[in-house]
Amino acid sequence: GWTIFQIPYLSLGYDLERNYFSRTKLSANREFFILLGLFFSLGMPMVFKFSNEELLRYLVYVALLTGLIGVTLLTIFIPEKKIKNKEIGLISILKNMKNNSPLIKVMTVWLINSIANVLPMILFAFFITYVLGGDDFSRQKVLFFYFLFALLGIPFWTLLSKKIQKTKTWSLSLFTSAFFFIFALFLNEGDMVAFILISCLTGFCLGADLIIPPSIQADLTDLHKEKFKEDVSGVLFSMITFINK
């Protein structure tokens, strides 16, 4: 269900904005509110002392209410471009994508980055419990600060992408995040504060990793359309979803 929703949701950024920097701002606004939702969902049990069952119940209520409002506003106020009934074969699309070298390069980097992001996600709970000696509350606290600094980082990376190229901004965030993560190798039991600090620094870099790639993808979709005379924005953004998964 989320895949069905996500592909057109991501490609909306391409349809709504044509300006180079405006696409980054649109992507930043979208990811800001996603992170804000994550931030509040992590903060609720810390502030209100909810049990896991209570938290899940309240989050379901909030998701249903805000989702209904959001989808209603989306269908009413977001304009839909006219669709040209032109059939384009899948083989032709894949062949043209193969000949679009900038697109292949970005998708390759995206794939490597997605794999790199999965490893900490899988090992996170084990690292907190068996290396640092933490508990459930420790995990919530680390994630709370991680997403808090991701929120704070979004304006910085958005403005930086205006000063330098988007690809340079993304590269800088990836190298910076990888550099700070190295220090986690030297942590031992009880070094929770140090790990929270590392999480704050890498969380700050997460902002760029969320907002810059979709904006780059929108620009590459324009390039693809100009070069091959075909609008396959939905297909290209579905490739992103596939790579992320």
Descriptions of predicted regions:
Residues 39, 147-155:
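Residue-level signature of mid-helix packing/kink "hotspots" within the transmembrane helices
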